[in-house]
Amino acid sequence: VRAKKYNSYTNTGSGTSVKNILNRDFSTSRINQKWTTDVTEFKVCGRRIYLSGIMDMHSKEIIAYSLSFTPNMKLIMNMIKMAFRKMRNPKGVIIHSDQGWHYRHKSYKGFLKKKKAIQSMSRKGNCLDNAVIENFWGILKTEWFYLNKFDSIESFLEQLESYIHYFNYERDSSVLCYRTPIEVRYTNMIA
């Protein structure tokens, strides 16, 4: 059982990068203002599993995620479509990512444009520009992945779903004034 840093830049035939609008300004005043997304890789039972996730920078909620045995466009598009459905198609949200080929692909860029989202990308090879989601990957792997053994892919998937539910609904954080991501989201929706 091993987690590995996934390098998504390798497919250079996919579109161009966009400006780093976020420029490490992770501050927010409300939900659906800034989202951050990335892909990470796990090795479980001799198979690679790719996890694409998207987080609201205000609530720190994992809004949506998808899994695949291959790092393809379906992985990314399933995740981003799920996020927009769940959050009721917010307009003007800044969506920040690294410069991975998925995020430079015309189908991803076209979807964001159709949804009136603003795309932002980290500088090439600079993980600190996407520190919010990178920090979550570290928490996920430290608190859950490295502490568990998985006797099957199914076991991994079930436990991952449970951990993300725990992270969103039960795990409070000092950054959120000791509230959970879901508490922050619902407080914001009422305000």
What are these regions, as identified by a protein language model?
Residues 61-65, 119-122, 146-147:
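Short small-residue beta-strand/loop micro-motif enriched in glycine and branched aliphatics
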Residues 66-88, 94:
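Active-site beta-loop-alpha junctions of metal-dependent nucleic acid enzymes
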Residues 14, 18, 32, 51, ...:
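Hydrophobic (often cysteine-bearing) scaffold residues that line and stabilize catalytic clefts
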Residues 22, 38, 54, 60, ...:
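Mobile genetic element proteins and their domesticated derivatives, centered on retroelements
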Residues 1-30, 126, 180-188:
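Basic, flexible linker segments flanking DNA-binding modules
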Residues 106, 113-117, 139-191:
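C-terminal domain-tail junction helix/linker
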Residues 24, 28-63, 69-71:
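An active-site-proximal beta-strand-loop segment
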Residues 9-13, 97-99, 105-106, 121-141, ...:
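RNase H-like two-metal-ion nuclease catalytic core shared by retroviral integrases
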